[in-house]
UniProtKB/Swiss-Prot annotation:
Keywords: Cell membrane, Cell projection, Coiled coil, Cytoplasm, Cytoplasmic vesicle, Endoplasmic reticulum, Endosome, Membrane, Nucleus, Phosphoprotein, Synapse, Ubl conjugation. This is Dysbindin. InterPro entries: Dysbindin. Residues 92-180 form a coiled coil.
């Protein structure tokens, strides 16, 4: 169809060019024929000019229309080419579709066979899955039993080791406890002996000084014993008490001599209570600032009235019994030395 249209356009163009040639030839022949008639006839230039202009206009219009027709033909040609390509694709697709439609029955048979095989495979998979689940349960049970046995063995070993450690620890604690009890008994006895000895010496010294001079000089303080560093009796208040204003020394000497003759020991406090008019004793207690400024001294004043307590201390030393309360008391004294000093001070004041 496109080729026929192109042939027609070419034929029209050839006819148009041949017509133009014939027209030009005829005009030339008319000019040649009209030349010999120049003499008898006068030329009409205006008519020829009009005719020529009309021919030119006609030729220009024809040329323009021919050009427009050529452009339209090219456009139609391109569209026809595109349409032909499109319909060619459609034709090929229709041919393929026809072939595929012809293959549909075989495809349906294949699909049916695949469905049957899939159903068979599904049943097989279900059976295999059930067997795998059963196998997994068996494996889990075996693993659980194995872990139970391992944990049981580990627990038994742990119990045995802990029993051994507990027995060893108990034995060690028993030995340490027995050793500490013996040490504490020994240290307590040593402390009691040192305390008794210390108070006896202090009392003897103070008594000798009192018998020789008739009064106590507390200002002359003795250095504390090194062995009494852990059990010093803090009796600073009693140490700083001073006997002042002894107006009647002779009555006191008579009292002491009479006490020595009768072999009886009478407390000076009782003597003062019985004869307040004869013996006037003033106890002067210094201020806390003075006591703080003065250095601590040995507890010599506490032993002035300790003669009657010496047998009691010896009895306590003989009847010492160490128990758990003594152990805790010793540990508390070690942890808080200030508290132990206070307790020793209280004991000393009670003894006084």
């Amino acid at each position: 169809m496109l080729e026929t249209l192109r042939e027609r356009l070419l034929s029209v163009q050839q006819d148009f060019t041949s017509g133009l040639k014939t027209l030009s030839d005829k005009s030339k022949e008319a000019k040649v024929k009209s030349r010999p008639r120049t003499a008898p006839y006068l030329p009409k230039y205006s008519a020829g000019l009009d005719l020529l202009s009309r021919y030119e206009d006609t030729w220009a219009a024809l040329h323009r229309r021919a050009k427009e027709c050529a452009d339209a033909g090219e456009l139609v040609d391109s569209e026809v080419v595109m349409l032909s390509a499109h319909w060619e694709k459609k034709r090929t697709s229709l041919a393929e579709l026809q072939e595929q439609l012809q293959q549909l029955p075989a495809l349906l048979q294949d699909v049916e066979s695949l469905m049957a095989s899939l159903a068979h495979l599904e049943t097989s998979f279900e059976e295999v899955e059930n067997h795998l689940l059963h196998l997994e349960d068996l494996c889990g049970q075996c693993e659980l039993e194995r872990h139970k046995q391992a944990h049981a063995r580990h627990l038994e070993d742990y119990k045995k080791s802990k029993r051994k450690e507990l027995e060893a620890f108990k034995a060690e604690l028993d030995t340490e406890h027995a050793q500490k009890i013996l040490e504490m008994e020994h240290t307590q006895q040593l402390k009691l002996k040192e305390r008794q000895k210390f108070f006896e010496e202090a009392f003897q010294q103070d008594m000798e000084q009192y018998l020789s001079t008739g009064h106590l000089q507390i200002a002359e303080r003795r250095e504390p014993m090194g062995s009494m560093s852990s059990m010093e009796v803090n009796v600073d208040v009693l140490e700083q008490m001073d006997l002042m204003d002894l107006s009647d020394q002779e009555a006191l000497d008579v009292f002491l001599n009479s006490g020595g003759e009768d072999n009886t020991v009478i407390s000076p406090g009782l003597e003062m209570e019985s004869n307040p008019s004869q013996n006037e004793m003033n106890l002067q207690i210094p201020n806390p600032s003075e006591s703080a400024s003065q250095p601590p001294a040995s507890p010599s004043a506490c032993t002035d009235l300790d003669t009657a307590d010496a047998p009691l201390i010896q009895a306590d030393e003989e009847e010492v019994q160490v128990d758990t309360a003594l152990v805790t008391l010793n540990t508390d004294r070690k942890s808080t030395p200030g508290v132990s000093d206070d307790s020793d001070q209280c004991d000393s004041t009670q003894d006084i």
